[in-house]
Amino acid sequence: MKRTFQPSLLKRKKNHGFRLRMATKSGRKILSHRRRKNRCKLTVSDK
């Protein structure tokens, strides 16, 4: 049986990347909350 998690960096960035977060109001809200919490990585596209 094939496992459900088949990791792909491209798909990951397309769905949870910085550009996508900035594109929507709720995404920007997520970023602001993560900035307020002083997260090292805001999105998955951060290294």
From Swiss-Prot:
<dbReference type="GO" id="GO:0006412">
    <property type="term" value="P:translation"/>
</dbReference>
<dbReference type="InterPro" id="IPR000271">
    <property type="entry name" value="Ribosomal_bL34"/>
</dbReference>
<keyword id="KW-0687">Ribonucleoprotein</keyword>
<dbReference type="GO" id="GO:1990904">
    <property type="term" value="C:ribonucleoprotein complex"/>
</dbReference>
<protein>
    <recommendedName>
        <fullName>Large ribosomal subunit protein bL34</fullName>
    </recommendedName>
</protein>
<dbReference type="GO" id="GO:0005840">
    <property type="term" value="C:ribosome"/>
</dbReference>
<comment type="similarity">
    <text>Belongs to the bacterial ribosomal protein bL34 family.</text>
</comment>
<dbReference type="Pfam" id="PF00468">
    <property type="entry name" value="Ribosomal_L34"/>
</dbReference>
<keyword id="KW-0689">Ribosomal protein</keyword>
<dbReference type="InterPro" id="IPR020939">
    <property type="entry name" value="Ribosomal_bL34_CS"/>
</dbReference>
<dbReference type="GO" id="GO:0003735">
    <property type="term" value="F:structural constituent of ribosome"/>
</dbReference>
